[in-house]
Amino acid sequence: MKNAGPSQRQLRVAEQVRHAVAHILQRGILLDDVLKDIVISVSEVRISPDLKIATCFVSPLSTLKNTSHTDVVNTLNKHSRFLRGEISHALRQMKYMPELRFRLDNSFDNFSKIDALLRSPEVARDLHHSDKDED
């Protein structure tokens, strides 16, 4: 049962890491020009079974015109050691602080594409026809 999914401990620690990283990003203590005036959402954290690597899925909600989402993620990865030290204050109970890795969260984009497909006239027509067939 190796692929049974994350354990309860992994889920609990991942949520604590997500909360701590989100709190640090919200406070704005990272002094970097790329991250200036940008709101970053930490949607999910996945942690390895040994609790030593935490992959944080982030999505920049507002970026400047000359800053891409990839630049934001690269900047967060550049400052991951600093962030790791900062979250250590919130996660004192852990023996080892997990290494933070940041990835761009594309789930919001996928949701909007699916929503647009479901609202398309072709799908609406098919749904309308299937409702009449059931009557």
Curated annotation (Swiss-Prot):
Any Pfam family the entry gives: RBFA
InterPro entries xref list: KH_dom-like_a/b, RbfA, RbfA_dom_sf, Ribosome-bd_factorA_CS
Entry keyword set: Cytoplasm, Ribosome biogenesis
GO cellular component: cytosol
MF GO annotations: ribosomal small subunit binding
Domain of life, per lineage: Bacteria
Compartment list: Cytoplasm
Function per UniProt: One of several proteins that assist in the late maturation steps of the functional core of the 30S ribosomal subunit. Associates with free 30S ribosomal subunits (but not with 30S subunits that are part of 70S ribosomes or polysomes). Required for efficient processing of 16S rRNA. May interact with the 5'-terminal helix region of 16S rRNA.
Summary of subunit composition and partner proteins: Monomer. Binds 30S ribosomal subunits, but not 50S ribosomal subunits or 70S ribosomes.
Official protein name in the record: Ribosome-binding factor A
Species per Swiss-Prot/TrEMBL record: Bartonella tribocorum (strain CIP 105476 / IBS 506)
Gene from which this protein is expressed: rbfA
